[in-house]
Amino acid sequence: FVDVSRKKIAAEVEVEMAGLDVSAERKKEIVERRLRSEINRGVQTIQYQVVTLMTTNGQAPFITVFMYLGEARNPQEKADLAIIIEETIRQRYQGVKNEAGVWITPAFPKLIYVLEEDNIRPGTPYYYLTELAAKCTAKRMVPDYISEKKMKELKLSKGETPGHGDVYTCMGCRSFLTPDRFTDAGVGNIANAGNYEPGKHKYYGRFNQGVVTINLPDVALSAGGNIEKFWSIFDERLELCHRALRCRHDRLKGTLSDAAPILWQYGACARLKKGEPIDRLLYDGYSTISLGYAGLYECVKYMTGKSHTDPSATPFALSIMQKMNDKCKEWKTAENIDYSLYGTPLESTTYKFAKCLQKRFGVIEGVTDKGYITNSYHVHVTEKIDAFTKLKFEAQFQHLSPGGAISYVEVPNMQQNLEAVLQVMKFIYDNIIYAELNTKSDYCQVCGWDGEIDIVEEGGKLIWRCPKCGNTDQDKMNVARRTCGYIGTQFWNQGRTQEIKERVLHL
């Protein structure tokens, strides 16, 4: 599209400059300046349309923008893509204006920037984009980062060797498709997709059928700490999840393309005929269905008395992950449905799970004594650990969450220490598929405070309070925090708020 606009503008300039003594170089400068202006307006339009559009449940659409230079088909297209990426990051750094006319951090669209050989080190052609991304992350918490190196090493289709896998975006904040197997199997263009290329792996347009999450601390507590009972109950709960996932799958079977034409007829997911069922898209790996899990830390803590970061407890934690992966593989082989293991974000369900555990088992120190349970495989938010050790440790678990997972490090204000941000980004590139940096981005509309707004307890309830003027009116403040994979700006329930309050810094 950039080159289409460039040619259109060039034709207009030729007409305008006809008969004038204007050099070709000068005309080119005019064309590129106008092109940049058009890109600026286009990116701005997308940003403001996303943050002002509401879905039927009153939320902004959960949209993710994937910025990967490796998708370009030729050098000119890569250079043009770099222009769009640069403009997108610059505008996110600037932010959007709130009611008071102050630039604040928007929640959407989520931005993902791929770290690759062309941009990861000083002297590489697009390192300037990586420096700009670091600057933006330090202020606005995005973009998040995917490592081309680790994806190519770990996201492998049948027959591929490490280093030759596929690089593709997640859906939403963390849900990853399984590597394309239907193309390798010769199934063909089952979605009648316009972007299908014979023999080339396909990711855009595929989808997920749904998620069912197993509460791992509940399994451990139900077993009373007995290891034999644990594995027995674990098997029972996994089969219960399997039945629930089949309910989701069977509910989709028989759905006609007319139910959502934009998805099934006009190319978002497929180009099926009117009245055609979507059933064939539910098999052969075109779509995935996810077994989610939560609270690995609390599960291991109860069973072993130690954090899963303890070397003596880590093997048990990994064996739990492997067990869930083995079940997904077993179901997939039997049913030709792509089950995959997914690190559930638990944006608000964390509070529900925690309260249910307390009701069933009481308050147990280190296990059920919080208003939340830990996201997926993550290190507990209160555990003191440095950023690099945390990412390295969690990488082994992320590899065992092929259906989706994300790791993060909590950092202070890094706007004056961008070199440290770049060091973390380089570490991500070398060690983990997908990670993000969390900071704070707040604004008090009463007094103009733009530092961190505090979480304090008042009357047995956690509230947000401006440290400068004492404002506690949530309608008169802008607070942006990483909920899990997304940035949240609409405040949270008491469990998630407690989790946010208790996060320790890793850098």
What positions do the PLM features span?
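Metallocofactor- and cofactor-centric catalytic cores in central/energy metabolism, strongly enriched
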Residues: I39-V43, Q47, K301-Y302, R496-E502
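Generic secondary-structure boundary/loop-capping signal
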Residues: V211, L216, Y286-S290, R481-C484, ...
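Glycine-centered flexibility sites
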Residues: G292-G295, G403, G485, G495
